[in-house]
Amino acid sequence: MNKAILILYFSSRKLKRAGLKMRRPFHKKRPVGAFITPQDTVDSIIEHPVLVEEKAKIYPRSKENDIMAIQTLDKFASGFSKTTGQIYADGLNAIIKNHGNKVRVYRQIYSEEEIKKDSTKAHASLHYFPSEKKSKFIIVCPGGAYANCEALSEGYPLAVHLNGLGYTAFVLSYRVREEANNLAPVEDLAAAVRYVLDHADELNIVPEDYAVLGFSAGGHLVGCYGLDKIGYKKFNLPKPGTIMIAYGLISTEKFPHCNKLILGPEPDEKAVIAISIDRNITPDYPPVFFWAGKNDLLLDYRHHGDELEKAVRMNEIPYEYHLYEKAQHGISLGIGTEAEGWVDKAAAFWAKHSMNEHSVNVHSANDYSAK
């Protein structure tokens, strides 16, 4: 949580104790095709007609006294290294632009029959960011501690960047909070992959050698997807060409905060170990690119990035691990930090380990791939 949010948070608490509410700013009705600017408030963006229609995930809290409501995108972004609100605006504007080009951005990944049996599945979806040409695809899983899905900062901006590298990108909104029990997010990722593969022609994608990318809890999600017992094999899906993890949760034993959300209220030790990625890597695990920051105050790199490196090295999995001295948690693209450019390195790693003729020619970075 950045300083600006903290200030607003404590201000809102004082107002609550006084029986008052933070005033929501007045917004004129926005034209349907209007683009977002960094000076727009979160509250006004939530009401944008196109973003409402495409069910964009802006921010999970939108009540009248919400501390986020009065912040501009620039203010919201100010707590994350040198990221500016323009990065977030670009992600949202890509949705608006695609919608204007008659692209159906929002995609329901479960059938009506599946949703009828389990209504929580209606809350899992994809947002589609097409490449200009037929290409390989990647599914981006934002973080949020399995309590939220932070697509605004860790989803849409990544999709735009990946489009620029020549890939078709999808941003997954998976089930969170109590709906995440029984590893529902992993099921959602599997359903998303199946949806894309089943609609390959319509979506103009190459079905082979796809990638999955995740941040923080989303990193844990994509990491689990690569495991033999609970991942892609369980759902009879093809093996991903590459897994990409940014400041990811790896050891659930060392960070039990999320366990009750994805396993249930009283998970036993055996269940926790089963979703600890470092404890379940096998020689058939997909090639993996991952990075961590020594200045990450939420997920200690020694318990997560370093432990994953030990596991993949032991199993001779092709991998690339970057450990940044000053990188913090939640910096997404890493703009203005030593981590900036990591997405391009990850794409180069993906291309290097691909046997697909549609691989994008991205400049390759040095890596620590097992021989």
State each model region's role.
Residues N2-P38, V42, D306-E309, R313-K371:
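C-terminal catalytic histidine-bearing segment of alpha/beta-hydrolase fold enzymes
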Residues P60-S62, I67-K133:
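N-terminal cap/lid segment of alpha/beta-hydrolase-fold proteins
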Residues E150-L158, F170-P207, G334-G341:
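Catalytic nucleophile-loop/oxyanion-hole region of alpha/beta-hydrolase
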Residues S135-G143:
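Short beta-strand element of the alpha/beta-hydrolase
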Residues A191-L261, V272-I273:
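Primarily recognizes the serine-hydrolase "nucleophile elbow" in alpha/beta-hydrolase
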Residues D284, F289-D296:
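Short beta-strand/loop motif that positions the catalytic acidic residue
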Residues L297-D306:
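Conserved alpha/beta-hydrolase "acid-adjacent" motif
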Residues P265-N280, Y285-P286:
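Active-site nucleophile elbow and catalytic-triad environment of alpha/beta-hydrolase enzymes
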